[in-house]
Structures are given as structure tokens and as C-alpha cells.
Amino acid sequence: MSKRDFYEVLGVGRDASERDIKKAYKRLAMKFHPDRNQGDESAADKFKEVKEAYEILTDPQKKAAYDQYGHAAFEQGGGFGGGGFGGGGADFGDIFGDVFGDIFGGGRRGGGQQRAQRGADLRYNMELSLEEAVRGVSKEIEVPTLVHCDTCDGSGAKKGSSAETCGTCHGHGQVQMRQGFFAVQQTCPTCHGKGKIIKDPCNECHGQGRKQKTKTLNVKIPAGVDTGDRIRLSGEGEAGEMGAPAGDLYVQVHVREHHIFEREGNNLYCEVPVSFAMAALGGEVEVPTLDGRVNLKVPTETQTGRMFRMRGKGVKGVRGGGVGDLIVKLVVETPVNLSSRQKELLKEFDESCGGDAATKHKPKSEGFFNGVKKFFDDLTS
């Protein structure tokens, strides 16, 4: 598959200044960054494409080569001469870190020296009942992760020894493959990007500085969370390499469906059945809330589907904004399993509502059938 033009990738013209290129990169990096698009392979590919375009177009030598030869300038065996590995030189990762670190708090520092890599972030999916989500709860969870080896204190080296600076890249973690008049930055094949090598590894972790362990954590879930909310536990992710800081643990909340209530924002919704007689004559019906049962006054001649708002009976949002309401929908139940006598009484009642009294006693039915009659009259006229 052919590569897209680097200028097109960043959405800038060929006469764009370095400032314009950095501005375009910053915007696209935020849009497609993997932390913002977890599980989206398409976004990850676009992020890599944007990063590659930025690294080429902000380096004067690489940009000049690209402007003259296009993508062929960076292909192996592209006619620009051979070369070997070499340490030192410009660290293009520092350029990337200057921009990218401003956005996400990362980036390398310190004259191109390679830092040990921070531990990976972890995600834990937590399922809650509606009651737990609304009121808040503390949950104990077990998380399989990598922790610092306590035998070598995370260094990976045996006690009494230490990691040494890599002789191939001189601690940079990257080397340059020279191709004619420019160089391409690559991960050091000796230390695999770490900048250091361990000649006498720890027997416990075999030089990794980390080992597998299941951690038990107590997670406090604040009141008002909902499905999709994420709780960050700083430093509870995987331990970093060679004593580097640990990543974070993100607890992803999912609230189970409730058998009575549905939640929308800070409001709760429920359906309450009422009898045919109560809907017609009025009365009181018991309504469930998260705080207990309350009585709702049903007006006379209530139609099925009518909504009632009970203020302050919803959810207090986790981000503030007050307490939501409980929206109650009354559903008029049709009587079933009627006796002969009950059927006769209903027939008598229905007959008493017919004739001239139909409009008075059945306003919706009368309006519906008048509408149907008008519809067919219009079709035949």
C-alpha cells in the first residue's frame, strides 16, 4: 500500500512554516492519540502516520531529501549509500518530546539520554448495581500486574552490581543508520532502546527488574457515577522498567440494568401500573424511589402514558449540578381473567358510553376515528 504525501497527512501546504507544521501535528496528535482512542486500530495507524510525517518535515535534512526524492529517500536500498550504526548525533525523539510532551505530559529530557520506560497503564472493568453507583461504594479488586522486583529494587541487576551504559548507542537508546547525506534514527539493537545493559542480572527477575504479581486494591467509587465513567488510580499500573515510575490503573465503570428504574443523566424513569378504575376515578398509588416508597396522587380521568415528575428523587451527579428527578409513567392495566358478571358490567358500561355520550367519555377514540374518516374522505375526493 503506497504511503500518503506527508504534507497531505498533516493537512499543510508544501510552503508551510515549521510553526504551521508543529501546530498541525499538535492538533492531529491529540485527535488520534492511543490514550484517547483505546482499541481503535485505525486511530493508532493514523497517529503513527502523523508522527512519521512530523519527524520528517521538521528536520531540515530529511525534509530536503523528501522534497527532492519523496518516500524513496527513506526506503532501504534506495540509492543513497550504505552505512553502519553509530551513537550520538541529533536525537529526533527530543524534538518529538518538546511538542508531544506539552500535550500529554511525556517526552524525554536531558540531552538525548534514554529514560527507562514508564510502566504501562492498566484497565479494570467494574460492574456496579444502580444502588451502588448512586450511593457510592468501596470495592476490593484483584489486579494481575508487574511490580518492581524487591530483590534488586527494580534495577534488574544482581545486588552489588548495576546496569552499565550501552556501548553501541552510548546511552541514547537509538542509533543512526547513515544513508548518504542524511541519517535515519533506529532503536539500538544491543540494548533495545533502554540505553543500558545488564551484565550480571538478578536471579529473581532474570534482569527484567519486574515480576508478575496479583495486587489487591480497595477502590472507592464516588456517588453518582454512571456507565462510561473512569476512575484513575495513579501509580497502580505496571511497574516501569529498571526502576522507572509505574503506570496508572483505570477503573472502567459499567452499571447493570435495573429491574425497576432506567437512568438518563441524573434523572430516573420508571413505569407504575394503575387499575382502570383508579385511572378513571383518581386515587393514590405507591411509587418506589431510591429512598423508599412514596405515594403519588393520581388525578381523575388519567390516560395511560401520562408522566409525573417527582423532584429531587433522582441521582446526585458525580460532577455536581444538583439532584435529578424521578419521572413516573402511569400505565393503565387492562383487566384480565374476568368473571361472567364482570364482563356483563363492562359491556353495560361500554354501551352507556356510546351514542351521543361517546365524545364526552371517549375523547381520544372519537378524535382518532374522526381523523381516519377525514383521511379516507380526502383520498376519494
From Swiss-Prot:
A zinc finger (CR-type) spans 136-214. Residues 5-70 form the J domain. GO terms for cellular component: cytoplasm. Binds 2 Zn(2+) ions per monomer. Zn(2+) 2 binds at C166, C169, C188, C191. The keyword Glycoprotein does not apply. CXXCXGXG motif repeats lie at residues 149-156, 166-173, 188-195, 202-209. The keyword Phosphoprotein does not apply. It is found in: Cytoplasm. Zn(2+) 1 binds at C149, C152, C202, C205. InterPro entries: DnaJ, DnaJ_C, DnaJ_domain, DnaJ_domain_CS, HSP40/DnaJ_pept-bd, HSP_DnaJ_Cys-rich_dom, HSP_DnaJ_Cys-rich_dom_sf, J_dom_sf. GO terms for molecular function: ATP binding; heat shock protein binding; unfolded protein binding; zinc ion binding. It comes from the Bacteria. GO terms for biological process: chaperone cofactor-dependent protein refolding; DNA replication; protein refolding; response to heat. Its cofactor is Zn(2+). Keywords: Chaperone, Cytoplasm, DNA replication, Metal-binding, Repeat, Stress response, Zinc, Zinc-finger. Participates actively in the response to hyperosmotic and heat shock by preventing the aggregation of stress-denatured proteins and by disaggregating proteins, also in an autonomous, DnaK-independent fashion. Unfolded proteins bind initially to DnaJ; upon interaction with the DnaJ-bound protein, DnaK hydrolyzes its bound ATP, resulting in the formation of a stable complex. GrpE releases ADP from DnaK; ATP binding to DnaK triggers the release of the substrate protein, thus completing the reaction cycle. PANTHER family: CHAPERONE PROTEIN DNAJ (PTHR43096:SF48), DNAJ HOMOLOG 1, MITOCHONDRIAL-RELATED (PTHR43096). The J domain is necessary and sufficient to stimulate DnaK ATPase activity. Zinc center 1 plays an important role in the autonomous, DnaK-independent chaperone activity of DnaJ. Zinc center 2 is essential for interaction with DnaK and for DnaJ activity. Homodimer. Belongs to the DnaJ family. This is Chaperone protein DnaJ. It comes from Vibrio campbellii (strain ATCC BAA-1116).
